[in-house]
Each structure stands twice: as C-alpha cells, then as structure tokens.
Amino acid sequence: LTVTDAASGRVMAGKTVSLHKGNNKISLPFIIRNPRLWWSNGLGEQHLYDFRTALTINNETSDIQSTKVGIRSLKIINRPDKDGKTFYVELNGVPVFAKGANYIPQDNFLPRVTPELYEKTILDAANVNMNMLRIWGGGIYENDLFYELCDRYGILVWQDFMFACSLYPAEGELLENIRQEAIDNVKRLRNHACIALWCGNNECNDAWFNWGWQKRYKAQNPEYEKKIWKQFTDQYYVTLPEVVKEYAPESFYWPSSPFAREDGGSDDHNGDRHYWDVWHGKKPIETYNKERSRFFSEYGFQSFPEFESVKRYAPCEEDWDIYSEVMMSHQRGGMHANQLIETYLLNEYRKPKNFEAFLYMNHVLQGDAIKTAIEAHRRDMPYCMGTLFWQHNDCWPVASWASRDYYGRWKAQHYFARKAYRDILVSPITDEGEVLNIQVVSDRLKSCNGTLQVEVMKLTGEKVNSYKRNIKIDANSSQTVFSVPLGEALKNTPKEDVFVHAVLL
C-alpha cells in the first residue's frame, strides 16, 4: 500500500499489509515539511495536494484512489470573554471574519443541476468576496462536486445536518437511521478543507424554547413533553456529536442554529443569531445598525427576480402586477410578503411609475437593506465575527430573499454585497450624539496606509464640505479613522438634503 504525491511523483508513505475479509483500517503516517497551506477566499491561495493511494497485489495495481487535500488548521473559538463567549473561525492561527450567505438546493428537481451550474454558483460567491456558505438544514447534503468547488475557490462551509424547523421521533430504528446517515456524510466530507463546522439542525432548538412548542406540549401532556425532549437531546446532544467526535475528531460540533445556551435562551453575547425583526418584524432598515451578535447566521430581505426573469413565468402584460394570480403564485411569502415589500419601498422611495420600475426599486431596496446589515456587522468586529445573509440562491423562479435568482441572474443585492464584502470597507455612520464617524474595516493580514477622502454632498451634486486625511489601517481590524460633529460637516444644510461619500484614494 503506497501514498504518492501526484504533482512530484514522490512516494510519501508505504508498507506491506495483510488484509482480512471485510473492512480494513490502515494508517500510513507521513510528514510534509513546510507545507503550502489552504486559505479561505481573500486570505491566500487554496493549495490542494493530490495524493494517490494505491494497493498493489502480486505486482499488479488492484485499486487506486485520488484524494485532493488542503492542509490547514481550523478551529471554532467559542470561549468566555468579558461579554459572554466568542464565536469565530480561526484558520491557520488567524481569526477570520465570515462573510457569506445561506445556501439552499439549486433546483426542486436535483438532476437538473449540472456541473456548470454548480461551478457558477460557487464562483458567484467567490467573486463577491464571500468566504463562507451555510448549507441550510432544510435542504440536502450536497454532492461531492459542491465541496470540491468550495475547496478550490476557498469557500468555508457551515454544514447543517439535515433537520429543520421540526421535531423528530428520534428513538429506536429511526435514531439508528439518523446515526448511520450522519456517519456516511461525516466520513464522506471530513477530508475537505472547506468544512468549518457541523451543526445539529436549523431552528429546532429555537422552535422548542422560543416558538411555544415546549409550552404547548407541556400544557397538553407533561409526560409527553418530557419524552419529546428526551428524544431531542438523544439526537442533538448525544448521537450527532458522538458521530462527529468519532469520525471527524478535530471538527467542531454546534447543537443548533441559532444557539446561545443549552437552556434555549438566545442573546446578543453568545453563539449565533437569526435576526428577522427587519422584514418579518417590520422594523425599519436602519435597525440593523443597532443590533449585535457574535455571529449573524441568518437575516434577509425579499425582492422579486429582475424583469427579464419575471417575463419567463409572467409573459403577458396583464400579469405585470405584484398582486396578479401569476405573481402571487411565484411569491414565497404570499400576500404578507408583497405587502411588506410595498410598505418598506414606499417608506424609502417614491411610488414607482410602472411594474418594471417597481421591480428595479425593489432590487435597490433589498440591496440597501442587506448592505446596511453587512456594514453594521463588520463595523462591530471583533465582537461580531460573521455575517451570512439569507440567501445565496433560489430553487425555482420566485420572489424570495435570494441575491441571485433561479436563472443565475444577479440582483442588485449581489452587487451591493460584492462592495460590502471587500477586504477593506469604508463605512460612514452617524451615532446618537450627532457625530459623523468613518470606520474602516480590514480583513487583510498586514497593515497598510491610505488617504481617506470624505465629501458631504447635496443631492443636487453641490459640495457642502470635504475632508482629506492620511490614515493607517491596522491588519484584521475595525477602527474609527475620522470623526466630525454632524453640525460642522453639514454647515446648516438639512440632513435629508445631503449624502456622505467616503473613499480611500
């Protein structure tokens, strides 16, 4: 049995083995001195070693397997600090701010997803400076190609086990089926450099404690409530973590998303958070600027596909109304969601003159909302160390929270995300004390210098005020590099008549 580096032809390890009937577990340890490391998108190269493992019997090759492996150290740092507990990825000893989105299956009919579509989907993440996708627990364990592409393009994967928004009778044969399914997938995926963590489920813990499920079952039958909770803990606190510990012992297991504490409480100081007060909760978009979490693993804002995509399922002009039967049939959130889009849009902009203009302004609205959230989360670094919006893609032509529609067309949000996810972000913000602050966030691993230019402009294009400063940008940091009282910056010009343009020259 030999292991060979395909690039150099060097035999890394080999030994003579005796095989018995059935499974044979054989270890072939070897050392790679000064290895080329695998980095996530934006931090370095995604070097993959190609190892060929060959079994030779009587001087003939009986079997050969090729495995591409990225060498990296990866930890989820979840330890106490003065505010609660940290929650972030440490890659090759470096804290990494996770920038990305949630991923769902690409089609309701999975055989229609071609290798070309897989590559476009992952490239569309990498090309807007994402470094993480969360595979949502209501979808599927993706095929090998998906993870190979994430390895190739430096996209870390938050991997949910496939359980979502439900309770499962996890005992007996079903619990054993759950265990075997988990074993199959952990073994299949454990050698991929992209795998960042394993998560037990999507929102099941939150549903039990915060959606009223526990109270309802307890009121109906306290003994039944105890039985359900026993099954729940057997599934997410015993079976799944045991599988990860046995088959991928260096991987991190997280019981649920969102999750803060085992008693079901959710707070801003621990774990990850799904934040939906903007959108479902109808709060203003600027509320994003005030919310905190260690890691935002879900939040979102809806839009329709762009007009050319809509015309593929609503080709007739009489259907060009968001409340038409056709458009309502392609709305993931029903009447409620259309009303939310309309309310938010009219709060921010004038009424669009026609259907096409409405779709366009809806795209701008969605993009501005998610940009506001991303910038707020990045400014809060290192307290907050992750932002994954809902969602990266769609599985059918529909109005949804996706930044790319079913046909792969980028919505405005995807372009907004590309800018908000750049390695150096310049983000103006006013605080409650009526001070204009300019924050610069850098994901770079080395400090650098730059010239900051800040211009206060009227909407007519007339310049009200301008500033220019030479600044030092610290590595892997968020810092306020310029502040000025708002009154001084505006020179008595009403706030509603101006905008701030800040740029690094």
Positions of PLM-derived features:
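Secreted/periplasmic carbohydrate-active enzymes, especially glycoside hydrolases
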Residues: L1-M132, R379-D380, C384, R409, ...
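Short, solvent-exposed loop/turn and secondary-structure capping segments
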Residues: A13-K15, P80, L110-V113, L145-F146, ...
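Active-site-adjacent substrate/metal-binding segments within catalytic domains
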Residues: P35-W38, R52, N59-S166, G172-L197, ...
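Active-site proximal loops enriched in glycine and acidic residues that flank catalytic Cys/His/Asp
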Residues: G100, G137, Q159-F161, C199-N202, ...
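A general structural detector for well-ordered alpha-helical segments in enzyme core domains, enriched
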Residues: T121, F146, L174, I178-E181, ...
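A generic secondary-structure signal
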Residues: D124, D184-R188, E242-V243, T372-A376, ...
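Active-site neighborhood of glycoside hydrolase catalytic domains
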Residues: R152, Y168-D263, Y407-G408
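Substrate-binding clefts and catalytic carboxylate motifs of secreted carbohydrate-active enzymes
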Residues: W198, N205, Q235, E242-E250, ...
